[in-house]
Amino acid sequence: HLATWYDVFEKAQNQGSELWFYTVGIFQKGSYPNKTVDVPLIESRILHWLNYRFGLKGYLHWGFNSWTDDPFAAPGTHRGDGWHVYPKTDGLINSLRWEQMRNGIQDYEYLWMLEDKIRKSVAGPGERLSIIELSRRGVEIASRIVETMDTYNKSPDTLYEVKKQIINELLDLDIAPQIIVQTNPLEHSTVANDCAIDVFGWAQPGTKVVVNGHSLPLSDDGLFMENVSLSRDNTIVVEAEHEKGKKRIVRSFEVLY
């Protein structure tokens, strides 16, 4: 239902409603990520990448310990959808699915940390916070794992590579020159041939910003904005130079010929 009627739900989000999502175990053969025992384990982790990718605030579990008479041998019609842990005489036994759910929540926290770091970087007087979309970079990165609600990457190697990218970008924001680069459309979007990209962002005062070879002026607040054609390799290359250092930032796009 969320994917089918997402436009309606998104409108409610924009009006201030908090949106969570839910999966049903009996549909585990569908194309959406799930957390039952008979789907790839990484899907339990991907659920929270989907949360960040679409601005959702939570995931509703049908049950934590709603066991069958023998949860070890009889997962039930919903294939373990009603529990993430197993019973023992003196407590609970953890599960791999529960651990991956925890890892997915921690991945979400890394994306939130990146958003918070961007917020702190651009905080101050002027129009910075009205122009910079704080979650935009995290959404771009998360889209490498979750492209749509039913199109997602199940490769653990790719997930770890993307998580490393989040960590590197978090650390990079502490290194001069500080710069936030955003594009419209988002990085990794599919665009028409000869399409121009809106490039905008913020850089710390005194930074020289060059985008695909064109020098851009900065406002008193450090804001910049320009409509730029893609390079031959379908990228936007932003070079930032300051007396304290240099940076080179690349944003890539898919081109439809």
What are these regions (language model features)?
Residues 39-44, 78-86, 229-242:
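Short, structured secondary-structure boundary patches
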Residues 70-71, 192:
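Extended hydrophobic-aromatic, low-complexity segments
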Residues 1-68:
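Catalytic-core regions of glycoside hydrolase
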Residues 56, 71-177:
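Catalytic domains of carbohydrate-active enzymes that cleave complex glycans
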Residues 176-257:
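Ser/Thr-rich low-complexity repeats and stalk/linker segments
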Residues 29-30, 90-93, 188:
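Generic signal for short, ordered secondary-structure residues
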Residues 32-34, 71-75, 217, 221-224:
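Short secondary-structure transition/capping segments
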